[in-house]
Amino acid sequence: MEQQVEQQRLTAKDFHPEILKLFDRYVHGMIDRRGFLDGAAKFAVGGMTAAAILQALSPNYAWAEQVPESDKRIATMMLDYDSPKGQGKMKGYFAKPANLNGKIPGVVVIHENRGLTPYIKDVARRLAVANFVAFAPDALTPLGGYPGNDDKGVEMQRTLDQNKIIEDFIEAVNVLQKRPECTGKVGAVGFCFGGSVTNQLAVRVPSLAAAAPYYGGQPKAEDVAKINAPLMIHYGGLDERVNAGWPAYEAALKANGKKYEEYVYAGANHGFHNDTTPRYDKAAAELSWQRTIDFFNKNLRTGGRATN
């Protein structure tokens, strides 16, 4: 049965809503594996065991390649960089259009709570196809990088100093701004944990020219006044955990006169952009991504802040 689950691409509609909530709590460390299995067993249907449900909800990175590494439109490489206020020696995945002449804007891509997965690398390649230079650091660099297994990646990232991780991504903005391929105008996009970090970059990096957090934790209300970058904020309509922080964030944005757009995708779960799991919502992912590309084109190619 588990082999069949692995081969068949399921969607969120194939699972009881309570199972999806349990899975969200599991991947964010609120319950352990045993807690998920015990909870999911109450909703197991169609001959699927709780273990099979967990397997079915876990990423299948064979589905992540919208832009293959071999795509002749792009060029990629791993970059080393120093993060003196963060974790020290770091690595990141760099993607740009092939045969690039001149300079173009950049986007820092910030991963979820498990390191630099194949999905996040593919997001960087999608940005390169859209004519940006993209840089996706791996917060797990000090531990050897993303281990090839999401559960292990989550465990590894949980052991790291979260403040230092944020410093690593702040430094990544500086690195990308100074790249010879980049105009110096840089935005950020992040997912889940990366959405939270994207919000923090908006607070802490005055030169950030645009920020697009996906279903990320919100900054403290008292920090919102520090935001300079325009924001495009994406939420899944069913993501009760993250969405609970939005009213206070929105009130602070309005009170401080900040420029923002916020979109809630009805019927979409947390993680709806990640096309490697059943929580993926194709319509919401494609619409939100087109909006994000349009947002970056508007704010990074005209006006805004440049450092070079």
Enumerate the predicted regions with their spans.
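N-terminal secretory signal peptides
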Residues: M1-G35
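N-terminal export signals
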Residues: D24, R33-P59
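N-terminal cap/lid segment of alpha/beta-hydrolase-fold proteins
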Residues: E65-L100
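Short beta-strand element of the alpha/beta-hydrolase
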Residues: K103-E112
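Cap/lid segment of the alpha/beta-hydrolase catalytic domain
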Residues: L140-N163, G271-T276
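Gly/Ser-rich "nucleophile elbow"/oxyanion-hole loop immediately N-terminal to the catalytic nucleophile
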Residues: D150-V189, R301-G304
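Primarily recognizes the serine-hydrolase "nucleophile elbow" in alpha/beta-hydrolase
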Residues: E171-N228
